[in-house]
Regions:
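Alpha-helical transmembrane segments and their immediate juxtamembrane cytosolic regions
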Residues: 1-395
Length: 395
């Protein structure tokens, strides 16, 4: 017997607030990440999970939550087949938007070079890197979980587990090394949706829990599940210690980035060397530990990274659910950007492009902070203007 649920409002305050916080976090880390004075924890890294790296999984968590919340309404309103068809068309539209927003680098300088490359080789760099960023991953992941979006929690969790196992297998076959060879993939590349489905499906589960009557809201369960996911993600990342370089081989391997057998370590690599560093703690440099599948890597979309980040996203959302839906607190800045997240995402790259050319990488902290404030102010002006004129971009 399924648990009783309550109808949620058209817009859930906690979800908008959570999304707005995530948008502002994205503004921060995307703007400051290239400056020398900024702490490493605010920068994106390819070999561990920093604060910057937990931002994108929160978007996928919010996508899964909203998808679960709105799709059933659409089915009830339009019928099953029209609802599925409409979602597929909207996801195709989002994929097209992502291709336009991200663009692509030119694969050839002359017509002859383009003809010699052929269509597949010409499109390969864009498919591997340029197009598969946040918006495309949202579209691909949403399409991937669409068959189970109406299923029970158990089915969805099994689907997430199967997707994770498939990602490990394909990474062992080719995908991990492919993502880390030029041109390097972004956010897991074309197969990243397999592990991005983890935070998305946890978002759908959170939606089910929030829909329970107040007296049955499983606060403890949400906190325990978020903690378990974070611990499991960190535990999986401890496999990275198999790839510590012995002291006598550091000089020999100092220029090598990727480990031998980066997914399934060979027998002589299976030596216990202790636990991995905690998330948000920088690991040893590549001369001391080679890159491998078990480290937390946004570039490769690794299992440990997205399992930990799914738990972290759930814990952050629980905070907003309590503060906003139970205590009835609401923060205007989070509401502003949370209700118009897509246009905020598209605009922020343009605004950064107008400001950052005038901020050298080695600028002092006061100059970086001032330019960051200018960036936030311009974004606020643009998005506030759109809100006042009731202009919202949603797909």
């Amino acid at each position: 017997m399924s648990s009783p649920t309550v109808a949620l409002p058209q817009r859930l305050v906690s979800l908008d607030q959570f999304r707005g916080y995530t948008v502002l976090g994205m503004f921060l880390v995307n703007y400051v990440g290239g400056f020398v004075v900024v702490p490493e924890v605010l920068k994106h890294h390819n070999d561990y999970c920093s604060y910057a790296d937990v931002i994108m999984p929160q978007f996928l968590f919010a996508v899964g939550f909203a998808f679960r919340m709105t799709f059933e309404r659409r089915v009830q309103r339009e019928g099953l087949a029209p609802a599925y068809g409409r979602v597929v068309k909207r996801l195709a539209g989002l994929a097209l938007v992502s291709m336009v927003v991200y663009g692509a680098s030119s694969p050839a300088e002359t017509w002859k070079q383009l003809v010699d490359l052929g269509p597949l080789a010409a499109l390969a760099p864009a498919l591997k890197r340029n197009w598969f960023q946040t918006l495309m991953h949202i579209a691909a992941t949403s399409l991937w979980i669409l068959p189970v979006i109406r299923a029970g929690i158990g089915v969805r969790l099994i689907f997430a587990l199967a997707s994770a196992i498939l990602h490990v297998f394909l990474s062992w076959q080719f995908n991990f090394e492919w993502c880390n060879t030029s041109p390097n993939a972004i956010d897991g590349g074309p197969l990243g949706f397999l592990t991005w489905s983890i935070p998305a499906i946890i978002g759908t589960v959170a939606c089910d829990w929030v829909r329970m009557p107040d007296s049955r809201t499983p606060w403890l369960r949400m906190i325990v599940v978020s903690t378990v996911l974070m611990v499991v993600g960190w535990g999986v990342s401890c496999g990275t210690r198999f790839y510590d370089v012995p002291a006598e081989r550091m000089e020999e391997l100092k220029d090598v980035v990727l480990a031998e057998n980066p997914v399934l370590p060979a027998g002589d690599q299976l030596k216990y060397r202790g636990l991995a560093e905690a998330p948000f703690v920088q690991p040893p440099p590549k001369a001391e530990r080679k890159w491998n599948y078990w480290m937390m890597s946004q570039r490769a979309g690794t299992l440990s990274y997205l399992t930990f980040s799914a738990g972290f996203s759930l814990l952050v959302y629980v905070f907003f659910h309590f503060v906003c839906d139970k205590l009835r607190w609401e923060f205007g800045l989070f509401r502003l950007f949370g209700t118009n997240a897509l246009i905020s995402y598209i605009l922020h790259s343009m605004v950064m492009g107008a400001i950052k050319p005038f901020v050298p990488r080695d600028a002092p902290v006061w100059y970086v902070a001032g330019s960051l404030l200018l960036f936030f102010s311009i974004m606020w002006l643009f998005v506030r203007y759109l809100e006042r004129n009731k202009v919202f971009l949603r797909l």
